[in-house]
């Protein structure tokens, strides 16, 4: 199965979200795949910060993935070794179904994240995001 040609790099340079800011709860109308991706990656980065805020991060353990809206056999994941509270859009890694880093060279892919989430995203095309965390509550 072949994907359409990937236009790389995908712009993630403006991905620095403030630690705390009020956002809109209203749905956002995104017209292009790039706008949809940007919106979803902003929410993913915010999700990492929320997990951190509520204590769902034990050291560097855990991962959250998001299926790419334009290339459904690819997903975004946090790099290994980066604390959830520090993650920005530009830190995220785009990985294909074979574990190849498509975008985010120089960053370390968490092999456990890939092993778990690649199977989940392959088996459940209706699932766009998944999370796995270690917290003080799980001890």
For each feature predicted by the language model, list its residue ranges:
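An anion-binding catalytic pocket shared by soluble metabolic enzymes
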Residues: 41-129, 138-139
